Curated annotation (Swiss-Prot):
Expressed in leaf glandular trichomes. Monooxygenase involved in the biosynthesis of labdane-related diterpenes natural products. Catalyzes the oxidation of abietatriene to produce ferruginol. Ferruginol and 11-hydroxyferruginol are intermediates in the biosynthesis of carnosate, a potent antioxidant. May also convert miltiradiene into 11-oxomiltiradiene. It is found in: Membrane. This is Ferruginol synthase. GO terms for molecular function: heme binding; iron ion binding; oxidoreductase activity, acting on paired donors, with incorporation or reduction of molecular oxygen, reduced flavin or flavoprotein as one donor, and incorporation of one atom of oxygen. It comes from Salvia fruticosa (Greek sage). Its cofactor is heme. PANTHER family: CYTOCHROME P450, FAMILY 76, SUBFAMILY C, POLYPEPTIDE 5-RELATED, GERANIOL 8-HYDROXYLASE-LIKE. Keywords: Heme, Iron, Membrane, Metal-binding, Monooxygenase, Oxidoreductase, Transmembrane, Transmembrane helix.
Length: 492
């Protein structure tokens, strides 16, 4: 018997084992994975907290296995800067969840498109047109009208002595503010059936995108859609895209029929202008999917953050008093804050930053993917690896923040730290080329809604015995309170 084939096979196996072992030694450290499931059984209900604990043992550049999905967890500003800035091109890809394939969203959405010509055009239209300083200034009166509506609703509840579900009120107001800015229209009314329909669709999309899906970790299951995620996503995405397409087509037809009519100061007008001028190589479907991203991402994250801000202020009466005093000194007898007042409200800004530090709405940001092998801090991150940035862990790191678990807005009065993507210890909106495009609008919404609620009313819990309910949270697209915050407005 010729021994050569056996020797060759043995050498091949040995070489493969050696290369694999050497490659494994160069990967970031992490807990040992179990067969098939990897480290999934270790995650618990709050993965961001689990990752933070594990990073204390394995370091700020850590690897785990989520089923067959190899994942690297980043837990320090230094490593976040390496990923998002120094090697931003390499880590500009996205891991695409099965739900995002609904209605081909992954092929059209700016949030999930690979960095290329289409992505650059969409990014450019956001930066230069939709969210430019001038565009935001032009549309602020539309938003002020919606803040007045929130004020009137709270006044009515105050007169009747009934509590407000802050999450629901913030959701409706955020949706109205976004609808006014995008379409010059009011999407929802308080206490209406239309409200519940919008709430159902947008929260449906958010919950499906945020729910753990076995098919994302075991690709062999994707064709079977065992949890029905893709089927449900197709329904919710389709309904929301249908509404948005209706608004866009209605505006296009109106412009054709009334070419001399005055233009509106909203984003939709800007987008139709861009389509007409052919300044960007984009189609109508790109814009409808962009609007979907803005509605779902903006309304869900802003709503969640406003609820956390109000909880923290309610739990810290002295902080609430400081915000009220500052607002009174700047606003005087005005009931609705003007966006131009924001630079004169440093304590309000500090409150929002501190809440974002403690409660980043998306604690792990949107997942990134390595487009090629890359060595970071001496460790190999292989092509195709998912990369998660644990913004929550960085916000609670005692080496970065004094008393990290305490709500202390004053820390931001002494530090020139912002959440716009250059200070990596505070990046709730991300950073680099994948930073959230809607951040300028979200920033204004968070400050103006908080100011309107705090300036005009004192607040008390509807059920004081529920004061410890903030301890439970629900992990998903955004990490929200497990028990909705219901508080009673008292006319100040």
């Amino acid at each position: 018997m010729d021994p050569f084939p056996l020797v060759a096979a043995a050498l091949f196996i040995a070489a493969t084992w050696f290369i694999t072992f050497k490659r494994r030694r160069n990967l970031p450290p992490g807990p040992f994975p179990y067969p098939i499931v990897g480290n999934m059984l270790q995650l618990g209900s709050q993965p961001h907290e689990t990752f933070a604990k594990l990073s204390k043992k394995y370091g700020p550049l850590m690897s785990i296995h989520l089923g067959s999905l190899y994942t690297v967890i980043i837990s320090s500003p230094e490593m976040a800067k390496e990923i998002m800035h120094k090697y931003g091109q390499v880590f500009s890809g996205r891991t695409i969840a099965q739900a995002v394939h609904a209605c081909d969203h992954d092929k059209i959405s700016m949030g999930f498109l690979p960095v290329g010509a289409e992505w650059r055009d969409m990014r450019k239209i956001c930066k230069e047109q939709m969210f430019s300083h001038q565009s935001m200034e032009d549309s602020q009166n539309l938003r002020k009208q919606k803040l007045q509506q929130l004020l009137e609703y709270a006044q009515k509840c105050s007169e009747e002595g009934r509590g407000i579900d802050i999450r629901e009120a913030a959701f409706i107001t955020t949706l109205n503010l976004m609808s006014a800015t995008l379409f010059s229209m009011q999407a929802t009314e308080f206490d209406s059936k239309v409200t519940m329909e919008f709430k159902e669709i947008i929260e449906g999309v958010a919950s499906i995108v945020g729910v753990p899906n076995f098919a994302d970790y075991f690709p062999i299951l994707r064709p079977f859609d065992p949890q029905g995620v893709k089927r449900r996503a197709d329904v919710y995405f389709g309904r929301l895209l249908g509404l948005i397409e209706g608004y866009l087509n209605e505006r296009i037809e109106f412009r054709k029929a009334n070419p001399n009519a005055p233009k509106k100061d909203d984003f939709l007008e800007t987008l139709v202008d861009a389509l007409d001028a052919k300044d960007y190589k984009l189609k109508t479907e790109h814009l409808t999917h962009l609007m979907l991203d803005l509605f779902v991402g903006g309304s869900e994250t802003s709503t969640t953050e406003i609820e956390w801000i109000m909880w923290e202020l309610l739990a810290s009466p002295e902080k609430m008093a400081k915000v009220k005093a500052e607002l009174k000194s700047v606003m005087g007898g005005e009931k609705v804050v003007d966006e131009s007042m924001m630079p004169r409200l440093p304590y309000l800004q500090a409150v929002v930053k501190e809440s974002m530090r403690l409660h980043p709405p998306g604690p792990l940001l949107l997942p990134r993917k390595a487009e090629s092998d890359q060595v970071v801090n001496g460790y190999l991150i292989p092509k195709g690896a998912q990369v998660l940035i644990n913004a929550w862990a960085m916000g609670r790191d005692p080496s970065l923040w004094k008393n990290p678990d305490s709500f202390e807005p004053e820390r931001f009065l002494d530090q020139k730290i912002d959440f716009k993507g250059t200070d990596y210890e505070l990046i709730p909106f991300g950073s680099g080329r994948r930073v959230c495009p809607g951040m300028p609008l979200a920033n204004r919404i968070l400050h103006t809604v908080t100011a309107t609620l705090v300036h005009n009313f004192d607040w008390k819990l509807e059920r004081p015995e529920a004061s410890d309910a903030h301890k439970g949270v629900l992990f998903g697209f955004a990490v929200r309170r497990a028990v909705p915050l219901k508080i009673v407005p008292i006319k100040a």
